[in-house]
Regions:
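Short Gly/Pro-enriched turn/cap motifs at secondary-structure boundaries
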Residues: 12-19, 44, 110-112, 152-157, ...
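A glycine-rich dinucleotide-binding beta-alpha-beta segment and adjacent secondary-structure elements
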Residues: 51, 240-318
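An anion/pyrophosphate-binding glycine-rich loop and adjacent beta-alpha core
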Residues: 116, 120-236, 240
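Conserved redox-cofactor binding core of oxidoreductases
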Residues: 1-73, 93-94, 143-144, 252-273
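Glycine-rich loop(s) and the adjacent beta-strand/alpha-helix scaffold that form part
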Residues: 69-143
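Hydrophobic "anchor" residues
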Residues: 62, 173, 300-301
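Short, acidic, Ser/Thr-enriched surface-loop or helix-capping motifs
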Residues: 57, 68, 167-168, 295-296, ...
Length: 318
């Protein structure tokens, strides 16, 4: 058969005990590569598919692909089939912003540099049906102060259970900080500027203390001794900020968020004791739900709504 590439996808869920063995998708990729080679398969690295070959003037069975390596093109024949496992297109600013204009160059991405739409466009050129390409998930817990996923994201997400996130132009909250990722990001984009998460020393449970330490060490999360310092540093209206913090803390004390319906953790305390921990937050593209259309057997569907013989899709490419 033809070559099989194993490429990164957005993320994987790995049991906590497995993290030390090779966190997230890396351990999966390495294990698959090892099994392929044990079975006598070959992996062609730095080899980019540029065309899918189909019988019948690009309407029939997929018979292989043309790929480029070191400036040279090679045709690979597939006797059983071709699997599209090219991942998402989160790093492809031109393509993603064509689907969702909000996701321009001002929005970062948690993915690796190879997460482009190249493989998807090769498939579309071969008559594959693209499905819901504008359904691109953003991650609301990242900071514009660092590249990619960064080290502060785990702290921002953990502290969202305890801390308010405010609009620096008003000093006010704008969303339930524990809402789903889409609603959170949509609300952030509506504000239109990076937001401020304001946590405090009384709201650092043991299970996320290491995340805070990492964010502080990187300079992404910063310590402040008062609301006045925060307002001065980030040009936040002080009166609005104080009123919001008083209102939020009253909700925490009462155990009911009358502003946005947030469910407080049982160990949540009012955000009143310095040091305050402030982190700028802004969404980053995280996962592409759209991709090539497949059926229940992973067969890729063509523009005629019929399965394309010899072509399969897997992972974030679908």
């Amino acid at each position: 058969g033809g070559p099989l590439k194993t490429l990164n996808v957005s993320h994987s869920f790995v049991a906590e005990g497995a993290q030390a063995a090779g966190a997230s998708q890396q351990i999966v990729v390495e294990a698959l590569a090892e099994e392929i080679q044990k079975a006598g398969g070959r992996i062609f690295y730095n080899t980019t598919a540029v065309q899918l070959d189909r019988e019948g003037d690009n309407t029939g069975r997929v018979t292989g692909c043309v790929a480029k390596h070191d400036g040279e093109y090679t045709r690979y024949k597939a006797t059983k089939g071709v699997v599209l496992a090219t991942g998402g297109y989160g790093k492809d600013v031109a393509f993603r912003s064509a689907q969702d204009p909000r996701l321009d160059e001002t929005v970062g991405c948690t993915n690796f540099e190879g997460a482009t739409a190249h493989g998807l466009k090769v498939a579309l050129d071969a008559g594959v049906m693209g499905m819901q390409l504008d359904q691109i998930q953003c991650y609301p817990y990242t900071s514009p102060e660092e590249d990619s996923f960064g080290c502060a994201a785990t702290w921002i997400e953990a502290e969202s259970a305890y801390a308010p996130t405010i609009d620096p132009t008003t000093g006010k909250r704008f969303v339930n900080e524990l809402t789903d990722r889409k609603r959170f990001c949509d609300a952030m984009f509506e504000v239109g500027t990076p937001l401020l998460q304001i946590g405090s020393v009384d709201n650092v449970p043991d299970w996320c203390a290491e995340s805070l330490e990492n964010a502080l060490a990187a300079g992404v999360t910063r310590e402040f001794s008062s609301l006045e310092e925060i307002a001065s540093e980030f040009d936040v209206p002080l009166d609005g900020l104080k009123a919001q913090m008083d209102s939020y803390n009253a909700c925490v004390t009462a155990g009911e968020d009358t502003e946005f319906g947030k469910l407080f953790n049982p160990d949540a305390k009012p955000v009143v004791t310095a040091p305050y921990y402030v982190t700028r937050a802004w969404p980053k593209v995280h996962h592409c739900m759209g991709g090539v259309k497949t059926d229940i057997d992973c067969r890729v569907i063509g523009n005629d709504l019929e399965p394309i013989v010899g072509l399969y899709g897997a992972g974030e490419a679908t």
